[in-house]
């Protein structure tokens, strides 16, 4: 059985991201195989790295908290068999750069792997979309305009003038890094920094593309059509693949994430898949019953008010709520709360009729005059 990730890092389940990071750094220093030569230190370090990778990522941590290991679906990188790249570090010297201010090669004189200057994935973008109440319920299509980086069509992302190509950086020999040996309390380390000549790519563009000035990407305003699924709610996030920024040096684009907010409705209130609203009826409609037309998200709907309806009665309109995302044929309900309106003013004839009705029912009628007596008289009809 897999060990609990929180126990692995010796933190509580409500630990903050900073607490998790602090705990990981402390334990990683202790168990890193370049420092700790004990048998099992490397396996422990792998477990620590995997625990940190999961718990430092909000989405993965939420899935783990809810479903445990099953919630990760095998998709979490840097597992026990994946030493390189664990916890977001490119290799062993990456983590030492993080811990020891840019020193690597703990006394081993080891050569760090060259960072490739090839294609890299573009950045994801965020777009905040405000929907009307009923747009969120029934979905549809909307056009939005975004500004993003696209691959330069002239150089196809290389940054070089057509017919030419990037040259190996002479300053770093194509490694993308420059090194300097330093002695520290931990032993002999190599200080590693990105090459200032090629910015860490290992390549230099000597003949820049005239269209993008060597950047390989250009800014563009694009209008795209978004399909909004029925049933989205405030806080929903939609993903549009490939509409983020183009990657560097011809790499694949990132994604566009659309964060949804929904305007309030003057009549309806939503809770999950259900809709709530209030309708007013007269005291006579409550006593005698009636049919009335009420507003729903589908339009006017006739409802039956049964005789003797009490104040605050809730009627259920089955299947008139919000469609379920992914299964729009299944919908929640619409709950209609009835408010019985008692008149504050009454004509002499109506008052006389109500008095006779009260006597016929054998109910005491208030002798009070004016509004106070009227309210008492009508109130007795509901008891």
Swiss-Prot record:
Binding sites annotated in the UniProt record for Zn(2+) 1: 152, 155, 209, 212
Localization annotation: Cytoplasm
Cofactors (names): Zn(2+)
Domain of life: Bacteria
Binding positions (Zn(2+) 2): 169, 172, 195, 198
Ranges of the CXXCXGXG motif repeats in the UniProt entry: 152-159, 169-176, 195-202, 209-216
Keyword tags: Chaperone, Cytoplasm, DNA replication, Metal-binding, Repeat, Stress response, Zinc, Zinc-finger
Pfam families, per database record: DnaJ, DnaJ_C, DnaJ_CXXCXGXG
Coiled-coil annotated spans: none
GO biological process terms, semicolon-separated: chaperone cofactor-dependent protein refolding; DNA replication; protein refolding; response to heat
Entry similarity comment: Belongs to the DnaJ family.
Oligomer and partners: Homodimer.
Protein name: Chaperone protein DnaJ
Biological source species: Gloeobacter violaceus (strain ATCC 29082 / PCC 7421)
Phylogenetic lineage: Bacteria, Bacillati, Cyanobacteriota, Cyanophyceae, Gloeobacterales
Underlying gene: dnaJ
């Amino acid at each position: 059985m897999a060990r609990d990730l929180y126990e692995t890092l010796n933190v509580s389940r409500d630990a903050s991201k900073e607490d998790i990071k602090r705990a990981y750094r402390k334990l990683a220093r202790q168990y890193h195989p370049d420092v700790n030569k004990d048998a099992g230190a490397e396996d422990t370090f792998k477990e620590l790295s995997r625990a940190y990778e999961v718990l430092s990522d909000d989405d993965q941590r939420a899935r783990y908290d809810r479903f445990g290991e099953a919630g990760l679906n095998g998709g979490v990188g840097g597992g026990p068999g994946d030493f390189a790249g664990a916890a977001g570090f490119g290799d062993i010297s990456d983590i030492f750069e993080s811990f020891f201010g840019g020193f690597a090669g703990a006394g081993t004189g080891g050569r760090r792997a060259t960072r490739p200057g090839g294609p890299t994935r573009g950045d994801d973008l965020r777009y905040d979309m405000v929907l009307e109440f009923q747009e969120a319920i029934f979905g549809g299509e909307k056009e939005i305009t975004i500004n993003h980086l696209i691959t330069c069509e002239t150089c196809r992302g290389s940054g070089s003038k057509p017919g030419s190509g990037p040259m190996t950086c002479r300053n770093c020999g194509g490694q993308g890094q420059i090194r300097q040996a330093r002695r520290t309390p931990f032993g002999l380390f190599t200080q590693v920094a990105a090459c200032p000549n090629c910015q860490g790519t290992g390549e230099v563009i000597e003949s820049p593309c005239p269209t993008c000035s060597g950047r390989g990407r250009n800014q563009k305003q694009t209008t795209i059509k978004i399909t909004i699924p029925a049933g989205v709610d405030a806080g929903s996030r939609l993903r549009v693949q490939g509409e983020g920024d183009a990657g560097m040096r011809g790499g694949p684009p990132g994604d566009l994430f659309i964060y949804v907010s929904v305007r309030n409705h003057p009549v309806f209130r939503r809770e999950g898949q259900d809709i709530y609203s209030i309708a007013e009826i007269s005291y006579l409609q409550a006593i005698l019953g009636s049919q009335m037309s009420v507003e729903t998200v589908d339009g006017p709907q006739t409802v039956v008010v049964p005789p003797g309806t009490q104040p605050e009665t809730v009627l259920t309109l089955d299947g008139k709520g919000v469609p379920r995302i992914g299964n729009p044929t299944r919908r929640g309900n619409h709950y209609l709360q009835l408010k019985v309106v008692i008149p504050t003013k009454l004509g002499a004839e109506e008052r006389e009729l109500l008095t006779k009705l009260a006597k016929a029912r054998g109910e005491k009628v208030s002798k009070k005059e004016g509004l106070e007596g009227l309210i008492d008289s009508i109130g007795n009809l509901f008891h």
